[in-house]
Design a protein with these regions (language model features):
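Zymogen propeptides/activation segments of proteases
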Residues: 1-41, 51, 60-64, 376-378, ...
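Glycine-centered structural positions embedded in regular secondary structure
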Residues: 8, 15-17, 113, 234-236, ...
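Juxtacatalytic substrate-recognition/specificity segment
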Residues: 22-178, 185, 196-197
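Non-transmembrane alpha-helical segments in soluble domains
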Residues: 51, 58, 62, 156, ...
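Surface-exposed intrinsically disordered loops and tails
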Residues: 76-77, 86, 105-132, 136, ...
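Acidic/His/Gly-enriched intrinsically disordered linker/tail segments
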Residues: 149, 153-154, 169-242, 246, ...
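Acidic/polar loop patches that form or flank catalytic/metal-binding clefts of enzymes
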Residues: 201, 251-254, 282-283, 300
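Beta/coil-rich, acidic/histidine-enriched accessory regions frequently appended to metallopeptidases
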Residues: 262-395
C-alpha cells in the first residue's frame, strides 16, 4: 500500500479482516485499528458499518453500470477465484492513505479513497508497486472516522471505477478511456446515489459547482489537467450532470457505461441510442453552452428522467428511481468572490480581464461583449486558429 502523499511509494503492511459483507470484505491495516475508534484508527463496528453500506449499494450500482470483472490477468484473463485468496469478493482496505494523518484535515493529502487496476494483474510487481491479486479499493481511516457521508459517497465513486475497468477495458480488448470520462461517470454514480445515501448537496459532486463557476477555464470539458485536477473534476461533472439531466438520467448513464465506446463518442452514441436522435458531439456541446447562460430548456436546473428502477431489498415495495435532482448553477450557494465582489454563475471575461490561455479538449472562455439596444448591431471578430470556435449567444 502507498506510503506517501503522492501515492508513489509503496510498502507491505499487515491487515486483519474486521467485517464481512455479502459482497465485500473490510480489512483494517493493523497500525490503524483500535478497539475504540478515534483519529485515524477505526474499530470493528465502523468496519461493519461500511460493509453494510456497501452491501446495500452494490446491487443498486451494478443495476446501472454493470458488473466488475471476475477475471484476473495472468498471461491472459483467467478466473479470479483460481488466483486470488479472497476469491471474487471486493476487498475494502482501510488505513491512512498517504501516511499523512493530522488532526487538521487540510494537512492531509485529501484522498478519501482510490481504485488501482494493478490488483487485477496476478503477481504484478514493478517500480515498487505490487499487486494484491484481487478486487481492491482503498479508504482513508481518518476520513472513515470523521466524515461518514463523504466516505460512503467515495465508496460509490471508487466502485464505479472498478466496474468501468471491466466494462470498457476487460470486455473491450483493452479499450482505454480518458480520465475525465471515468471521473465523470464516478461523480454521476454519486449523483444518482445521493438520495439513497442521505448525502447533503454540500457533500455531493454538486458542491464542485462553485469551483466550476470560478475556474472552468482552467480545464477543457474533455480534459484531465494534472496541474488543475480540482478544475477538471468540476468541468467533468458540470458537463456530465447536464447531459444526464437533459437526455435520459440513469438510463442514459447505463448506456454510456455499457456501450463499447469511450469519451465523447460514448456519450454521443448513448444520447442518440436512447433518444432516437442524430446529434453530433458538437451539437451536445452547443446545448451545454446554452445552459451556462441560464437557458430554460437546456439547463442543469431540472430533474433527470427517472425511467430506470431498482426494486429489490429495501426498495422491493417502493422502487428506487435513481433521482438526479435539479440544481441552479446561478444560486448563491454556488457563487464566488473576486476583486471584492460576489459573482453568480460562470465567470465572464470583459475587455480589461486578465489573459487566459484557452484550454484544449473543449476548453471554454466566456467573453462579455456588452449590452445593446436598437434594431441591429454589428460585431466583428478577428480570425483565430482552425481549432477554435466562436459561439455568439444573445440574451
Amino acid at each position: 500500500m502507498d506510503n506517501n502523499t503522492n501515492i508513489s511509494t509503496f510498502v507491505q503492511k499487515s491487515a486483519t479482516l474486521r467485517a464481512v459483507g455479502t459482497y465485500c470484505y473490510v480489512w483494517v491495516v493493523d497500525d490503524f485499528y483500535s478497539s475504540t475508534a478515534g483519529e485515524n484508527k477505526v474499530d470493528s463496528a465502523i468496519a461493519q458499518e461500511y460493509a453494510d453500506a456497501f452491501d446495500k449499494m452494490y446491487p443498486m450500482i451494478t443495476n446501472v453500470f454493470g458488473n466488475e470483472s471476475d477475471k484476473i490477468y495472468y498471461y491472459g484473463w483467467r478466473n479470479m477465484e483460481d488466483y486470488s485468496s479472497t476469491g471474487t469478493k471486493i476487498n475494502i482496505v482501510v488505513y491512512d492513505i498517504g501516511n499523512d494523518y493530522s488532526l487538521s484535515e487540510n494537512q492531509q493529502c485529501g484522498i478519501v479513497g482510490y481504485f488501482y487496476a494493478k490488483d487485477y494483474f496476478y503477481n504484478y510487481s514493478e517500480k515498487g508497486v505490487t499487486s494484491n491479486n484481487g478486487k481492491y479499493f482503498y479508504i482513508d481511516s481518518g476520513y472513515a472516522n470523521s466524515n461518514f457521508d463523504t466516505t460512503i459517497s467515495t465508496l460509490a465513486h471508487e466502485f464505479q471505477h472498478m466496474v468501468n475497468y471491466n466494462q470498457k477495458t476487460v470486455l473491450n480488448d483493452g479499450l482505454t478511456s480518458g480520465q475525465w470520462y471515468n471521473e465523470m461517470l464516478s461523480m454521476l454514480c454519486e449523483d444518482m446515489m445521493q438520495e439513497h445515501l442521505g448525502i447533503k448537496d454540500e457533500d455531493s459532486p454538486k458542491a464542485r459547482t462553485t469551483t466550476f463557476n470560478a475556474y472552468y477555464y482552467y480545464s477543457g470539458i474533455s480534459e484531465y489537467n494534472s496541474k488543475n485536477q480540482i478544475c477538471s473534476y468540476a468541468t467533468a461533472f458540470s458537463f456530465g450532470s447536464f447531459i444526464a439531466r437533459n437526455f435520459g438520467g440513469a438510463e442514459l448513464v447505463q448506456k454510456i457505461s455499457k456501450n463499447s465506446y469511450v469519451d465523447n463518442d460514448s456519450i454521443t452514441n448513448a444520447v442518440n441510442s436512447l433518444n432516437g436522435t442524430k446529434y453530433t458531439y458538437d451539437d451536445l456541446f452547443e446545448k451545454y453552452l446554452l445552459a451556462l447562460f441560464g437557458d430554460s430548456t437546456y439547463t442543469h436546473n431540472k430533474d433527470a428522467d427517472c425511467t430506470l428502477e431498482y426494486n429489490s431489498g429495501d426498495y422491493s415495495s417502493n422502487p428506487y428511481e435513481y433521482p438526479m435532482t435539479a440544481y441552479n448553477i446561478f444560486d448563491s450557494e454556488y457563487s464566488f468572490s473576486a476583486n471584492g465582489k460576489k459573482y453568480y454563475g460562470p465567470a465572464i471575461f470583459y475587455a480589461n480581464a486578465k489573459s487566459v490561455d484557452l484550454r484544449p479538449e473543449n476548453g471554454i472562455l466566456i467573453h462579455g461583449i456588452g449590452t445593446f439596444s436598437g434594431s441591429s448591431v454589428s460585431v466583428s471578430f478577428s480570425s483565430g486558429t482552425s481549432a477554435e470556435k466562436i459561439y455568439l449567444i444573445i440574451k
